[in-house]
């Protein structure tokens, strides 16, 4: 299933479109994690992994934002963001994570 979404949120302000699991809400993400919906959870995790990895690779001369990070740490960060902002899209949570990792890696 391909879905397009203009990214607009507190931490994301762009007219670029995205596809895939990043279009689900944080509330959906938390449901996948808490209701044993592993198929959906793995799909969303793969989307997060790709987004964060792609963001890291898009800055080849910048610091590596994933040094000493595990997937579990990334997903726990997303969990906390989503608990605070359940109506945000997963892309907003993931973008906020990338921005935080970039600021700490400088």
Show the residue positions of the predicted features:
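Short N-proximal segments of mature Sec-exported proteins
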Residues: 16-80
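Bacterial Sec-dependent signal peptides at the C-terminal "C-region" and cleavage site
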Residues: 9-16
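Aromatic-residue detector
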Residues: 7-8, 41-42, 47, 98-99
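Surface-exposed, polar helix/loop patches in the mature regions of secreted/periplasmic/lumenal proteins
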Residues: 69-106
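Bacterial N-terminal signal peptides
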Residues: 1-9
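Generic marker of "main functional regions" within proteins
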Residues: 11, 36-39, 57-65, 88-92, ...
